[in-house]
Amino acid sequence: MRLTIRTPARSIGAALGAGILAAACGGSASLETPTATPTATATTTAAVTTASAGAWTLTDKSKATIRVREQLVGVSLPSDAVLTATGAKGSFELNADGTFTSGSMITFDLTTLSSDERDRDNFIKNDTLQVRQFPTAQFVPTKTSGLTLPLAASGTFSFTLTGNMTIRGKTKEVTFDVTAKRDGGDLTATATANPSWKFGDFGMTAPSVPFRVLSVTDEIRAVIDIVATGPTS
């Protein structure tokens, strides 16, 4: 995503080179003049610089959403528990070959996880995720597939994103199906985990709450919504 699509983006760009400019001019003194005119020489050299054209920075509108199927006591049909985490931070940038630069990372504050049920939120955060010890989740993007680079200055793009997700101190390589839209220096993207995750992938067990939850399906469906700003071209 130059998603920098980290265009990660995190659209998504590559490093630009800079050139060296040099110019010189000179003059000489006349022998017929009693007082010699000093020779004047001026030289101008521009410094060599390398500017990044692909760095995208997340805004506070970015979020992560997880869905888990649960069967509640006294409810005839199962339903989805939907929890959302905000407090996203980070940046990302793509290389010309579709990989990401070192330092590309997205971090979500798991202490902000919330749903429509406070008791569920507290159980998930304190017992399942153990947010006091592991308050954040980190995603380090490593490569894209199916993304044409360099990314056009505007348009929509679909591709696969691969990276390393760390939750509760355990890291797993994951893939996302991504749909992104770029409008100059603004980038939005929705990344859906495919395949979905198991609780055991991150050293967790499916939640179990006596007298409240009959069962929880061992499947985590994760979606990351990215809103980022970056280069305009």
Model-derived regions: residue spans:
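Bacterial N-terminal signal peptides that target proteins for export
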Residues: 2-13
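C-terminal motif of bacterial Sec signal peptides marking the signal peptidase cleavage site
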Residues: 21-24
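Low-complexity, acidic/polar, glycine-enriched regions of mature
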Residues: 26-233
